[in-house]
């Protein structure tokens, strides 16, 4: 939540050196090539490809960069799931035809980073600000200043401060419930997203929110709900910064305050007979060092708070895999007459689940990033995060062997193939630094 105040000069133009790393003609050329070719190198065919996006504010540019790379490969997602900023990215993907998705993502991230001081190669300070390098203190100061500006001035096309502030607004009014007005975001969503396309269900879209009255997680899914901008805004209504969104008489907040990683929704809601390849793009890392100052305490707390659901899910389903193994082993020892029993047949059915392959990308923050990183929208930081997403997804896809583990018959195999991991050592094998190699989804009828 923004909590400090500072003013930085607004930029009036976008120099060539600060444009998003996107070549429309090149992207469309690769997309056409992918559309017209056969994916002959893939041994295992997945029934679904899901793109699962965590919440994380300004860090969401990493997800947009990852999609730019993914969108020019054979792995076009047919199911996009998001929470908070992940819901906005997800709606931009599902709400545009393939050839326009990156263009629309680019427009959104260009817009929300247009109000902060831009850095150009003509500025003498830009080399150390752009690269970070060993000069972390100047870059950290710049990042903090841009976060302060976002807190004071708002973000173009996203949110603006309420005047007067909430303390001076009448109880029960929208202005009394949040620091910022998200009216600009609604206008942005209506301009950049084709909601008729979303509701045609060509791509499944699931958006996570929290019902304020019940405290339960709720997913708006275009398979059973007519999606509009209000559903996207409900998923990103993080209190107390943003106001709740009321839909059909129920008020909703940001899904991230309960579960910031929507992986469990995919595992629960998929048909157990359908295999799925999941690209999960997280913005907060569960792993980190012990803080040595108060700023690091705040940053580490936020990382743990918003990444813990992924670890919880992995630990929970790892326990289920042992139960499945025990059941399968027991069933194999039963005589034929018992195998015909209705209860035994039910056990055999629920333990026979199509595989889930989980490709896990996690944003690795720079040493100069602070606790305010999720509301630090400077153009230079957005560009870096976008490029990091492209790079990590590209590096992941240089290991096609992770799709060729045809021997897997159940459960989910998890791969973390980013630049901080060692290359795969064999088919279906995890890098050594990630000991939790196999997990299994919960089973639903």
Residue map of PLM features:
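Cysteine-centered motifs
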Residues: 6-7
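Small-residue-rich anion-binding loops in enzyme active sites
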Residues: 21-49, 210-213
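Patatin-like phospholipase
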Residues: 33, 44-50, 57-177, 183, ...
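Hydrophobic/aromatic beta-strand patches that form the interior of the parallel beta-sheet core
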Residues: 81, 208, 277-281, 357-361
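Active-site gating loop/helix substructures
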Residues: 160-273, 280, 291-296, 300
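C-terminal helical/tail subdomains of lipid-metabolizing enzymes
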Residues: 169-171, 176, 184, 189, ...
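Acidic, Ser/Thr-rich peripheral helices and adjacent loops at domain boundaries
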Residues: 292-330
């Amino acid at each position: 939540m923004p909590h400090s105040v500072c003013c930085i000069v607004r930029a009036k133009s976008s120099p060539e050196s600060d444009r998003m790393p996107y070549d429309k003609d090149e992207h469309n050329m690769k997309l056409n090539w992918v559309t017209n070719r056969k994916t002959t190198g893939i041994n295992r065919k997945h029934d679904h490809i899901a793109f699962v996006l965590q919440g994380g504010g300004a860090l969401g540019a990493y997800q947009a960069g990852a999609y730019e790379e993914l969108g020019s490969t054979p792995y076009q997602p047919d199911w996009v799931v998001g929470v908070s900023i992940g819901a906005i990215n997800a709606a931009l993907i599902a709400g545009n035809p393939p050839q326009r998705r990156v263009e629309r993502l680019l427009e959104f991230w260009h817009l929300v980073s247009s109000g902060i001081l831009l850095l150009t190669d003509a500025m003498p300070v830009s080399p150390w600000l752009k690269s970070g390098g060993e000069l972390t203190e100047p870059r950290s100061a710049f990042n903090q200043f841009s976060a302060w500006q976002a807190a004071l001035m708002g973000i173009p096309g996203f949110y603006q401060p309420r005047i007067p502030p909430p303390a001076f607004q009448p109880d029960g009014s929208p202005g009394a419930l949040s620091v910022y007005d998200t009216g600009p975001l609604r206008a942005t969503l209506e301009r950049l997203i084709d909601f008729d396309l979303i509701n045609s269900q060509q791509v499944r879209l699931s958006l996570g929110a929290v019902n304020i009255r019940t405290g339960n997680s709720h997913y708006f899914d275009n398979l059973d709900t007519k999606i509009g901008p209000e559903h996207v805004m409900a998923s990103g209504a993080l209190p107390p910064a943003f106001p709740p969104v009321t839909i059909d008489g129920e008020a909703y907040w940001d899904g991230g305050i309960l579960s910031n990683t929507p992986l469990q929704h995919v595992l629960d809601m998929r048909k157990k007979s359908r295999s799925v390849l999941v690209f999960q793009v997280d913005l907060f890392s569960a792993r980190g060092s012990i803080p040595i100052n108060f700023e690091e305490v705040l940053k580490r707390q936020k990382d743990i708070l918003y990444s813990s659901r992924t670890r919880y899910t992995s630990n929970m389903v790892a326990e289920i895999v042992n139960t499945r193994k025990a059941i399968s082993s027991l069933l194999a020892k039963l005589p034929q007459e018992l195998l015909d029993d209705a209860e035994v047949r039910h056990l055999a059915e629920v333990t026979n689940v199509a595989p889930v392959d989980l490709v896990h990308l996690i944003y690795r923050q720079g040493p100069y990033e602070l606790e305010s990183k999720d509301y630090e929208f400077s153009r230079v930081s957005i560009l870096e995060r976008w490029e990091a997403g492209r790079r990590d997804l590209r590096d992941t896809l240089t290991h096609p062997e992770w799709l060729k583990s045809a021997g897997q018959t159940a459960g989910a195999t998890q791969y973390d193939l980013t630049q901080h991991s060692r290359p795969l050592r064999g088919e279906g094998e995890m890098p050594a630094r990630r000991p939790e190699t196999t997990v299994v989804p919960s089973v639903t009828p």
